[in-house]
Amino acid sequence: MITVLRLDHRLGRDTRITTHVCLTARAFGADKVILSGEHDKHIIESAQKVVENWGGDFEVEYQKAYRPVIKEHKQKGFEIIHLTMYGKHVEDVVPTIRDNNRDKLIIVGGSRVPTDVYEAADWNLSVTNQPHSEVAALAICLHYMMDGSELKTVYDDGKMQIVPNNEHKEVIKNE
């Protein structure tokens, strides 16, 4: 199981980026996103609508405080992975992480990540040591963790399904 924890969501200010964290997590193979910070029912509803329309078992839930989420997952044996530009290079350590068969909690930062998150993590991973989008970091990390298999995932239980086509858009609508 791969769960993504989005730290300190802020209403209005973070809506678009947090929505993209959820969409990216789902598309790249995560099972769940937990949002911390300010409650935003619209993001949760939006993610549920994507699952309803496009399929899969993905879910989004809200927990105001992130510390209990990290503690609970650590107690359950999850490997805690924090995405940060200050960490070890993702490509150097993901094979070790991928191959140990533990459930994963991937932490994606918000405005400013407190020191205790770095300390709680089993791994502080970077996708480059340069500032960039947490969405890009999550996508690349999940891509490495899934060993590329997520790129061909097909969900048969959605209302819609894209048929890859080089010449035009093709969408099958399932009743």
From Swiss-Prot:
Any GO CC annotation of this UniProt entry: cytoplasm
Disulfide bonds: none
Record Gene3D superfamilies: 3.40.1280.10
Molecular functions (GO terms): tRNA (cytidine(56)-2'-O)-methyltransferase activity
Binding site residues for S-adenosyl-L-methionine: 83
Top-rank taxon, per record: Archaea
GO terms for biological process, alphabetical: tRNA nucleoside ribose methylation
Swiss-Prot/TrEMBL keywords: Cytoplasm, Methyltransferase, S-adenosyl-L-methionine, Transferase, tRNA processing
Pfam families in the record: Trm56 (PF01994)
Catalytic reaction(s) noted: cytidine(56) in tRNA + S-adenosyl-L-methionine = 2'-O-methylcytidine(56) in tRNA + S-adenosyl-L-homocysteine + H(+)
Predominant localisation class: cytoplasm
Keyword Ribonucleoprotein: no
Family annotation (SUPFAM superfamilies): alpha/beta knot
InterPro entries in the cross-refs: Alpha/beta_knot_MTases (IPR029028), tRNA_m1G_MTases_N (IPR029026), tRNA_mtfrase_aTrm56 (IPR002845)
Subcellular location: Cytoplasm
EC number in record: 2.1.1.206
Group of enzyme by EC: transferase
Subunit structure: Homodimer.
Biological role stated in the UniProt entry: Specifically catalyzes the AdoMet-dependent 2'-O-ribose methylation of cytidine at position 56 in tRNAs.
Protein family membership: Belongs to the aTrm56 family.
Protein name, per record: tRNA (cytidine(56)-2'-O)-methyltransferase
Organism: Methanosphaera stadtmanae (strain ATCC 43021 / DSM 3091 / JCM 11832 / MCB-3)
